[in-house]
Swiss-Prot record:
Function: IGPS catalyzes the conversion of PRFAR and glutamine to IGP, AICAR and glutamate. The HisF subunit catalyzes the cyclization activity that produces IGP and AICAR from PRFAR using the ammonia provided by the HisH subunit.
Protein species of origin: Bacteroides fragilis (strain ATCC 25285 / DSM 2151 / CCUG 4856 / JCM 11019 / LMG 10263 / NCTC 9343 / Onslow / VPI 2553 / EN-2)
Name of the molecule in the record: Imidazole glycerol phosphate synthase subunit HisF
Primary localization class, coarse: cytoplasm
Single GO term (MF): imidazoleglycerol-phosphate synthase activity
This protein's record includes keyword Membrane: no
Enzyme class: lyase
EC id: 4.3.2.10
Amino acid sequence: MLAKRIIPCLDIKDGQTVKGTNFVNLRQAGDPVELGRAYSEQGADELVFLDITASHEGRKTFAELVRRIAANISIPFTVGGGINELSDVDRLLNAGADKISINSSAIRNPQLIDDIAKHFGSQVCVLAVDARQTGNGWKCYLNGGRIETDKELRTWTKEAQERGAGEVLFTSMNHDGVKTGYANEALAELASQLSIPVIASGGAGRMEHFRDAFTLGKADAALAASVFHFGEIKIPELKSYLCGQGITVR
């Protein structure tokens, strides 16, 4: 079995790390460069940087901040937010990103997935999906969860895989920031239908939640923000807990 990955996420707004509940009520959580360095030193497997205002405000991800974070970490680094064309990808990879996460832009222009995979390789392309469970399944949302689309979670992620996405980062909007556990049932469905890795996001509150994402949700990686930013869970302790639960971690 491949080792499971633990991934802290930096949600960036106006150059600062923030964390909200159900995608609203944002509060500040610290300097992204300092946090990135700390997570890298603590043994995080990867780092995700999402400029949560970039798509909404129609501006480009702040490449200079990406460059500063990349210079301070020694782990793979995924960047998302406001990436609409290949030149955006090129600029961020040059700034030090290892992978690019696309969300709203991929829904609006699915061909972007094909183009990134073709020009830079599937391993660079992470499809991020913000989805909410309603009476009729899981619906995908645009612009940081502000706009509902007609895309359904399973069909959209399957299409993205076929177009060349190398990973899926699935955030449950129902679970985000609530700290009651990940959307394990939906995760397990995605894991069973996709051949690319699935990253669980939204809902981590306790160490058991990470265990459940891996055992029940069959996720390949688990992403979290506030539990790490506010020191509620420490990465070395989380990894030794998971080891004790029989889960292979790096």
